From Swiss-Prot:
GO terms for biological process: defense response to bacterium. It comes from Phasmahyla jandaia. Has antimicrobial activity. Its main location: secreted. Transmembrane segments: none annotated. Keywords: Amidation, Amphibian defense peptide, Antibiotic, Antimicrobial, Secreted. This is Dermaseptin-J6. The modification Valine amide is found at V29. Expressed by the skin glands. Belongs to the frog skin active peptide (FSAP) family. Dermaseptin subfamily. It is found in: Secreted. One of its GO terms (cellular component) is extracellular region.
Length: 29
């Protein structure tokens, strides 16, 4: 349903944000 779609989108956003944060940290080291 709609709720599971929202949860999936949230998970994807968290993953993308985590990857971006890791990339920024790696770049700054």
């Amino acid at each position: 349903g709609l709720w599971s779609k929202i949860k999936e989108a949230g998970k994807a956003a968290v993953k993308a944000a985590g990857k971006a944060a890791l990339g920024a940290v790696a770049d700054s080291v």
